């Protein structure tokens, strides 16, 4: 494998990893039946004259399978944390208990599970589109190098095959991540 090809594949791998990481973040925000700190980490709280991430005003814990707690560091922000979680659109109903905000995770209805599975499917399709876009960039770079005379037609074939193989690996990983997320969502 030529150094240029290795450099190109490393760049494409890095960019495809970015698409996978983005999918992981999207999936973390999808509520399943189990409690996970990632569910409420993106919530922003009105505090100190602006909006700050929940993780900057308290620590999130999972004391039980269907319960999250937020230990708020500044007692004056307990109400703001409770409001932010309630208004987050996640369908959660937090309750303040001293400096702790308890967040019970309700059982998902079958209809809601279906919606979440469809949303997960959309997220995975977006990740596949991103991976295919990276593949297209790689193929374009390969063809441009051939036009400049830097590589032969045989090299173009070898590089294109390597890029396609890399793309197939990432699409397979995305499908595996989707299957795992759907199992998690459907689990009662």
Curated annotation (Swiss-Prot):
The keyword Cytoplasm applies. It comes from the Bacteria. SUPFAM superfamilies: Ribosome recycling factor, RRF. It is found in: Cytoplasm. InterPro entries: Ribosome_recyc_fac, Ribosome_recyc_fac_dom, RRF_sf. Keywords: Cytoplasm, Protein biosynthesis. Gene3D superfamilies: 3.30.1360.40, Ribosome-recycling factor. Pfam families: RRF (PF01765). One of its GO terms (cellular component) is cytosol. One of its GO terms (biological process) is cytoplasmic translational termination. One of its GO terms (molecular function) is ribosomal large subunit binding. Disulfide bonds: none annotated. The keyword Cytoplasm applies. Belongs to the RRF family. NCBIfam families: frr. Responsible for the release of ribosomes from messenger RNA at the termination of protein biosynthesis. May increase the efficiency of translation by recycling ribosomes from one round of translation to another. This is Ribosome-recycling factor. It comes from Gluconacetobacter diazotrophicus (strain ATCC 49037 / DSM 5601 / CCUG 37298 / CIP 103539 / LMG 7603 / PAl5).
